[in-house]
């Protein structure tokens, strides 16, 4: 089932398409939409092991290269932020990036810190990243330019999924894809970055993406959004967990994911 669902999602990777082309998009405006599928910490050769993706590339797809090196170094959070900024960008440390779904208390915290209205997903500590980029960035990039441009043009964005891990019984949140989708104030109109995983002791850190839920939410989100960012998460967790595995168990887990 996991391979089937990933294959389904992978066929839409960074594709601009007419909504009416797909069965779940009936009765929706024919304006083009984008589904951005993030498979972090993997390679093109691994991606091409997915039959449906390979066939899409052979028949009508293209491969592009993008320099996503961040300001002051190359790591996941700077790379995601640089994609969203349209140039090399700097952000706060990992522990100071805090994307959370909207709630009454979280909205109060966000609005008190930023003076801006909260949206569906908000970076509660966005000012740390803004200040880090302003004070130490060398390229003049503006965080959240992509999301802001979407918002300014009346286009709605959504983020689904995360790369969270569990270590020593503690949840360590990783929602860095939101750095690509957010507006200049660290906001994303809607999505689900909290309840998209399931317990799976056979997978890295004892959790995995709930693909059944992800595919349902992707279909539903597609109806009312123009750009959907989907974080698969499992490829990141596998790469991070690799030192805990031997060659055989690593390959077995990779096969389950891909």
Briefly describe each language-model feature range:
Residues 2-11:
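Sec-dependent signal peptide recognition
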Residues 13-18:
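Hydrophobic core
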Residues 19-27:
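Sec-dependent signal peptide cleavage junction
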Residues 26-32, 42-227, 233-240:
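Active-site-proximal alpha/beta segments of enzymes that process anionic O-linked groups
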Residues 237-244, 248-250:
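Intrinsically disordered, low-complexity regions in plant nuclear regulators
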Residues 252-258:
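Metal-dependent active-site segment of extracytoplasmic phospho-/sulfohydrolases and closely related
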